[in-house]
Amino acid sequence: MRELGRRLAKLLRAGDLVMLSGELGAGKTTLTRGLGEGLGVRGAVTSPTFVIARVHPSLGDGPPLVHVDAYRLSGGLDEMEDLDLDVSLSDSVIVVEWGEGKVEELTEDRLRLRIDRAVGDTADEVRHVTVTGLGERWATADVSVLAG
């Protein structure tokens, strides 16, 4: 998952919203950790579950990474508006774990990644990732670099 995050970083730019979904332990934060490495941001990317959101400034001239865990939010745009994500969106890459039904109103352009673990004891590390690009931004984007 970490390597997938590094590859994903090559596609992203300021203004991008990435929504991650999958069961607990699927690898959402691990993917985001790789994304942070690929974007070259400062600080270790860890789960923002208890603080809801963390901002990781760029070490270079790239966009900062805003990492949000919406798991504990009850839903609706009101709670998300309190995080001022609409203000951060234009100059940051925003990654939201558990954001379905909560952040879609921020922008029509978003990239959704659904992470599923393979079933069975021997397949613990196998993940299946479904990538869906929505909106004009992703209509012509080549997401084939994510395969591997």
UniProtKB/Swiss-Prot annotation:
ATP binds at G25, A26, G27, K28, T29, T30, E125. InterPro entries: P-loop_NTPase, T6A_TsaE. Disulfide bonds: none annotated. SUPFAM superfamilies: P-loop containing nucleoside triphosphate hydrolases. Mg(2+) binds at T29, E97. One of its GO terms (molecular function) is metal ion binding. Keywords: ATP-binding, Cytoplasm, Magnesium, Metal-binding, Nucleotide-binding, tRNA processing. One of its GO terms (cellular component) is cytoplasm. It is found in: Cytoplasm. GO terms for biological process: tRNA threonylcarbamoyladenosine modification. It comes from the Bacteria. Belongs to the TsaE family. Required for the formation of a threonylcarbamoyl group on adenosine at position 37 (t(6)A37) in tRNAs that read codons beginning with adenine. Is involved in the transfer of the threonylcarbamoyl moiety of threonylcarbamoyl-AMP (TC-AMP) to the N6 group of A37, together with TsaD and TsaB. TsaE seems to play an indirect role in the t(6)A biosynthesis pathway, possibly in regulating the core enzymatic function of TsaD. This is tRNA threonylcarbamoyladenosine biosynthesis protein TsaE. It comes from Streptomyces coelicolor (strain ATCC BAA-471 / A3(2) / M145). The gene is tsaE.
